[in-house]
């Protein structure tokens, strides 16, 4: 959810 501000790959 926060992949757009924190590109950690946790979809």
UniProtKB/Swiss-Prot annotation:
One of its GO terms (biological process) is actin filament organization. Keywords: Cytoplasm, Developmental protein, Nucleus. The lineage of its organism: Eukaryota, Metazoa, Ecdysozoa, Arthropoda, Hexapoda. Signal peptide: none annotated. One of its GO terms (cellular component) is nucleus. Disruption phenotype: Simultaneous knockout of tal-1A, tal-2A, tal-3A and tal-AA is embryonic lethal. In embryos chitin secretion and formation of the cuticular exoskeleton appears to be normal. However embryos display a loss of denticle belts and dorsal hairs. Segment-specific epidermal sensory organs are present and segments form normally. The cephalopharyngeal skeleton is lost, and the head skeleton and posterior spiracles are deformed. In the developing leg, tarsal constriction occurs but the tarsal fold does not form. It comes from the Eukaryota. This is Peptide tarsal-less 1A. The keyword Cytoplasm applies. The keyword Membrane does not apply. Induction: Polycistronic RNA up-regulated by ecdysone. This protein is produced by a polycistronic gene which also produces tal-2A, tal-3A and tal-AA from non-overlapping reading frames. tal-1A and tal-2A produce the same protein from different reading frames. One of four peptides (tal-1A, tal-2A, tal-3A and tal-AA) produced from a polycistronic gene that function redundantly in several developmental processes. Required in early stages of leg development for the intercalation of the tarsal segments during the mid-third instar stage and later for tarsal joint formation. Promotes the post-translational modification of ovo isoform B (svb) into its active form which in turn initiates trichome development and promotes tarsal joint development. It holds the Pfam family Tal-1A_2A. The gene is tal-1A. Interacts with Ubr3. It is found in: Cytoplasm; Nucleus.
């Amino acid at each position: 959810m926060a992949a757009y501000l924190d590109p950690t790959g946790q979809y």
